[in-house]
Amino acid sequence: MKFTQSIFAAAFAFAAAAAFAAPVTTQGVGVGKHGDIQVAVTFDNGKIQKIDILKNAENPVLAKKVFTDLKDQIVAANSVQLDGISGATFTSKGLFAAVEDAAKKAGVTLGQADKKALKAAVKDLPKNASYDVVVIGAGGAGFSAAIEAKNAGANVVLLEKMPQVGGNSLISGAEMNVARNWVQPKLGITDDSPELHAKDTYLGGDKKGDMKVINVMTHNALAGAEWCRDYLGIRFEPDNLFFFGGHSRKRALIPVGHTGTEFITKFLAKADELGIPVITNMKAEELIKDKAGRVVGVKATMNGTEYTFNAKGGVVLATGGFGANPAMVKKYNPKIDERFKTTDAPGTTGEVLYMAQRAGAELVNMQYIQTYPICDPISGVIELIADARFDGAIMLNQEGKRFVEELGRRDVLSEAILDQTGGYCWVLWNDKIGAVSNTVKEHPTEYDAFTKQGIMTTCPDLKCIADFTKIPYDSLKGTVDRVTSMAGKGNDKDFHHRAGLVDMSQGQYYVIKAVPSVHHTMGGVRINEKAQALTADGKVIPGLWAAGEVTGVTHGTNRLGGNAYTDIIVFGRIAGKAAAEAAK
């Protein structure tokens, strides 16, 4: 018996040794945010040697750190029992699952992470470094500032507290308001102007914005858009514009893909081409001032380690707002409490505003917090697929009635929705509208996700829509018939739709449920028209600039749609050039 057992044990040991005698590669599949993630994993003696990403449909910017840094960590730790990448949770889980699936197929059991190996894999950074310009925040404003500073001859570094770049600039629709843009003449729009754009912005913010700053934004918008198109290579739709609420003209350029991915991928490529270091996971903690009161650097932390970035010319703040910080939102506007979700990126939490305040900057208009009216009731994210609203989609309450002009200001729409039964609405459009907006085609992953969630459907007729939404059919049909009877500009007797209603008599139809969600914080650092940070008494803080949502004087009480990208490009460029000049 013992002899037999010995033979069996020897055979087992031989088989086990043979199993790991040579490297083996197996494929595995996991589910990410936007579909399957397929990998090929090479094992040698039971340890991961290499991971190749074979297939995925994830956002290339958000997923970049997952498929680089996290992938390398898995190899170094020989484990999937690691923290995922913040802001890319579902993609991280999908990669973990795919690697585990491959391991199972290879007969390999992955255990706890090898922390020593993981620590050794972390790249060392100098604890004290000097640059001409330090830019904090790697969104649209930060990249614009860093690129312009570099092109002005400055040695520049871009710091980002999150594992990936982009922030709200990445996940937004990224439309950009530009008066007298190159698409307007194709649509017969010949009477727009920077002055009219400025007037719309000022009135849209209830006359609380700084008109000097607004005029700089609108008068530099075209140059900014041409810089994006011609220098960065950003592609815009050639023959279509968005008509956002509160504007008197259709003027918003639309990036290819209808999201900020087009911008951020091109920003990243240009930063790489220019050799601009982009350091992620680096959180700014405190601005450094010299004895004369000039900002000359920033103290930051990464994984508990302190770093100092000295800035000869100065620092540019481009960190966005605080819409993803519920406590801060409620502090400044108690009406927007825990019931509200947010459209914002996870890193939009506002700590840098207090950092700027400690350095002497005045914070203004902090109580003005915008909600976006058309968002996912479950997650709070913007329903970009419902941007068909800008081309004629209508908003209905549970009773099947229109209740507001669909192109009204965001705050007006949000309040109107909250006044309806259940505090939600339905957005309805047909193929005629869809042929112009192309939102279903441009956002297929949204369509799949919202359909699976049960908040969206496609129907051949209104009876099907009524069954799905539980709206009384007679009421629904009556509203659609009335809309059709008033099709055309100037014919809306009910709510005076500024662009004109569209014939909705024929399907097929699309409908989605929507609620308001926290979207943009108008308050922030007080700046002047040169993007310089100011004290409460209006004095310039030497060496400190700010651009984008971190500032608080451009949009007044309410930001008009499409103005965020105009803001970040224009003032990011101004701030970067000025900081570089100050270093000379």
Each language-model region and where it sits:
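Helical element adjacent to the flavin cofactor pocket in flavoenzyme catalytic cores
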Residues: 255-313, 353, 357-359
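Conserved N-terminal/central alpha/beta ligand/cofactor-binding core
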Residues: 164-277, 281-286, 395-403, 407-408, ...
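Active-site- and interface-proximal helix/loop "cap" or "latch" segments in soluble metabolic
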Residues: 22-117
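Beta1/beta-strand and adjacent pyrophosphate-binding region of the FAD-binding site
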Residues: 122-141, 157
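A glycine-rich dinucleotide-binding beta-alpha-beta segment and adjacent secondary-structure elements
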Residues: 286, 475-558
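Glycine-rich loop(s) and the adjacent beta-strand/alpha-helix scaffold that form part
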Residues: 303-305, 310-376, 382, 571-574
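An anion/pyrophosphate-binding glycine-rich loop and adjacent beta-alpha core
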Residues: 349, 353-471
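Glycine-rich FAD pyrophosphate-binding loop
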Residues: 151-171
